[in-house]
Design a protein with these regions (language model features):
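Short amphipathic alpha-helices in soluble, non-transmembrane regions
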Residues: 58-65
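Conserved catalytic core of two-metal-ion nucleotidyltransferases
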Residues: 67-100
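Vicinal oxygen chelate
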Residues: 57-58, 70, 120
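Residue-level marker for the onset of beta-strands and adjacent loop->beta junctions
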Residues: 22, 77-79, 105
Length: 145
């Protein structure tokens, strides 16, 4: 396992512990969810989804990392910000609406004893583009379970 992937795992487990210890609902999303299921690759950033009403709380929680200003995409009902831990970009996303709508297909993954919440691999497959390089690896993993 290369150093970058080791660093990404360390950060994901560290963040999972922080959120679990502080009762903050979350899930790793997009390709980060695929990574959390054990399909390792060099990610561009780490994507995490939180309840919409927790944006200020979560941002304040990571003040020491100097998070960006809160941005928004109105037509998507999305707020977001990012920060860096050990040169890894952490992208925090907050969608309008009840969090339950966004956590329906969250699954618990255990990595080295640490609970991590991530979108299911089947959820990722439903929304993946045809040429997504992760799709064959996901099918292979699902077929071995």
């Amino acid at each position: 396992m290369n150093i970058k992937i080791q660093n990404q795992w360390k950060i994901i487990k560290q963040l999972g512990k922080i959120f679990e210890d502080n009762g903050i609902p979350y899930h790793f999303d997009g390709s980060t969810a695929v990574f959390a299921h054990g399909i390792e690759f060099d990610m561009d950033d780490i994507d995490i989804v939180f309840p919409f009403d927790r944006v200020n709380e979560v941002r304040e929680f990571f003040n020491e990392y100097k998070p960006s200003e809160i941005g928004s995409i109105q037509n998507l009902g999305l707020k977001y910000f990012h920060f860096y831990i050990n040169d890894e970009k952490i992208h925090c996303l907050f969608y309008e609406g009840p969090y339950e709508n966004f956590s329906i297909e969250d699954v618990e993954v255990i990595k080295d004893g640490q609970k991590i919440w991530a979108k299911s691999l089947n959820f990722y497959l439903r929304y993946a583009k045809e040429d997504d390089v992760l799709v064959p690896r996901i099918h292979k993993l699902l077929n071995t379970k």
